[in-house]
């Protein structure tokens, strides 16, 4: 199946989650929401290191998403990186220093930018691959929500602030 008819949709939804809402409104986030990357700029390393009752932290969420995007980017280049993937690794390190926090945000930004190019570029895919591409957007939305539940500094604008 070709993704030609879907690339704009995939790009818009993923881009909105990462970079925020442009124009009058969005499909995933509230009007004027700055998106994940700019929200994370307002989170200190100390705040990113606070663990929840389940043991996760914002730093762990960001590491997990950055790692997942790196695997997707490798897949887009013809590799099959999923068999040996260590999904648990990102969740093991919950606290970060300021330099480590900056590095995690840079990795997320860079891997997200690469994945955005993949989403906007028409390609031939199997159903399972298209499911993974669409699933990456839903998965990112989950983590945006989870991060925003952990720290008030990462929260976007309320619907009433339109």
Give the role of each language-model region.
Residues 1-33, 37-40, 45-90, 124-162:
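Short, contiguous alpha-helical
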């Amino acid at each position: 199946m070709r993704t030609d008819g879907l690339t704009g949709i995939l790009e818009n939804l993923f881009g909105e989650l990462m970079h925020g809402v442009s124009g009058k409104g969005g499909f995933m986030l509230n009007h004027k929401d700055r998106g994940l990357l700019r929200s994370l700029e307002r989170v200190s390393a100390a705040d990113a290191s606070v663990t929840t009752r389940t043991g996760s932290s914002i730093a762990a969420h960001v590491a997990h998403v950055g790692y997942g995007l790196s695997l997707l980017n490798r897949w887009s280049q013809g590799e099959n990186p999923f068999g040996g993937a260590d999904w648990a690794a990102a969740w093991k390190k919950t606290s970060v220093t300021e330099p480590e926090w900056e590095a995690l945000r840079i990795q997320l930004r860079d891997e997200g930018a690469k994945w955005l190019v993949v989403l906007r570029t028409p390609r031939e895919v199997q159903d399972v691959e298209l499911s993974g591409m669409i699933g990456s957007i839903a998965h990112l939305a989950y983590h945006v929500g989870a991060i925003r539940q952990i720290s008030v500094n990462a929260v976007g604008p309320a619907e009433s602030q339109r």
